Amino acid sequence: MRFFLCSIFMMISPIWPLGENPLPGDPYVIVNKRTNELAVILDNKVEGVYSVATGKTDDLTPEGEFSVTVKAENPYYRKKNIEGGSPDNPLGARWIGFDAKGTDGRIYGIHGTNREESVGKFVSNGCIRMHNDEVVHLFQTIPVGTRVLITDDNRSFEEIAIEHKALIKKQDIPIE
């Protein structure tokens, strides 16, 4: 009977990944609101650090660990009915949406901009803005499911990544 109940439960329950998340080597994104920088962790190293814009006030850009749920090229701006690719579109060249505050990845995201001069400043309504060429690179680098950590921290990206198991310290790497 126990076997039967366990079998039924396994068939109707979602399949969860086994082990730690992220796995060593998986892409991982860290946004530091204190410095307005974004780091990409890839293959156990910081692959790149980019200047970004975050919320006008500290509470607008949510903090926590989220997952990329949607990606779009030349995203449509629904709020003002602006087609993707338009020079008037504030979302720029790419949209990388994540599930902050229980949303579906269409409210909060990392995106390009039509105001390149705003990058590096505290000016957004909660999203993370990047230069268009840099968000295109990020878009190509990270898949849906990538973890995104948004924090306000005075530590280095390496220290933050080690704490969140996105980087393994050299002495912790097993020798085969």
From Swiss-Prot:
MF terms in GO: glycosyltransferase activity; peptidoglycan L,D-transpeptidase activity
Annotated ranges, domain L,D-TPase catalytic: 27-151
Active site: 111, 127
Involved pathway(s): Cell wall biogenesis; peptidoglycan biosynthesis
Record EC number: 2.-.-.-
GO biological process: cell wall organization; peptidoglycan-protein cross-linking; regulation of cell shape
Domain of life assignment: Bacteria
Keywords: Cell shape, Cell wall biogenesis/degradation, Glycosyltransferase, Hydrolase, Peptidoglycan synthesis, Signal, Transferase
Sections of the chain in a coiled coil: none
Keyword RNA-binding attached: no
The keyword Lipid biosynthesis belongs to this UniProt entry's keyword annotation: no
CDD domains in UniProt: YkuD_like
N-terminal signal peptide: 1-25
Pfam families: YkuD
Family note: Belongs to the YkuD family.
This protein's name: Putative L,D-transpeptidase YqjB
Organism: Bacillus subtilis (strain 168)
Phylogenetic lineage: Bacteria, Bacillati, Bacillota, Bacilli, Bacillales
Gene that this polypeptide is encoded by: yqjB
